[in-house]
Amino acid sequence: MKRTISIGFCLLLSASLMTTPSLHAKVMKMKLATVVVPHHAYNEGAREFARRIKEATGGAIDIRVFPGGQLGKGERELLEGMQMGAIDLAVTATGPVSGFSQSMMVLDLPFLFRDYPHVDAVLDGPVGRKLLDDLEKAKLKGLSFFENGFRNFTNSVRPLLKPEDFKGLKFRTMENPVHLASVRELGAQAVPMSWGEVYTSLQTKVIDGQENPVAIIHSYKLNEVQKYLSLTGHFYSPAPLTMGLRQFTSLKPEWQRLFITTAVEVTAYERKIIRDNEQKQVLDLKAWGMDVTNVDKAIFLKAMEPVYAKFIKQYPDWEPIVHRIRDTK
């Protein structure tokens, strides 16, 4: 009887050791950073990613999420931090990423994506994976594409219903050549600026406006410093979940696969949060006093069309990518 109990106990102990790290095993601690406020969808997705990784590894990997620019006020700092090994993972906009991988910048072309189903078909397919893989040249590992949504203009001067309304206004953009060129095509002055400076610059009238997805406009209560919101949807804003390449390759192969598959699964979770909240957030902004207008996107596309010719001339390898994206159903 004692022998039976002993064998049973040993089997139970062995099973528990397979799913729970040893008391003496070293837990691998990682940092995942963003620059956005804690309740933004980036961070909800990041926390879910961390939770699933911890659960799947039996607690052997513990990822802590640092929101709100705690590890770097600008997204470029986060990307550089991953290259240096000071930060393990980050969720950022593609704007700063384009400074590390020019192929990623193709996603920032104006009116490239028709709608959210088109986005999913492109970014979750071969085109998206190739763009993520290109980041390895910059010592970064692209895991998947979170999102921030389609970007829209806000300003404190007047409603923006047509391109001519932009003339003479100063707009903050990300440090991204495509964004800068696109805003200039509308006749506005484009001012590249890190996100941490934007609210104060709007408040003090250093700039007249900015452009961002509804989620950011809502999360940061830009209605307090901006009167007008034009739902232009001129750029789609993907947000790569990225890891330092050195940190990624230091993982054993099964954990590398786990990080990629978990990132892809959590991406659907994060995008759903953005999309489900968007309509309610627009209604909130109206209730908070913003003048919200829809626009004829076709006239904005026509005004920004020269941007395509300019950048395809500069980067000829973009042309087949643009065609593949536009042909994706």
Feature names for model-found ranges:
Residues 1-9:
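Bacterial N-terminal signal peptides that target proteins for export
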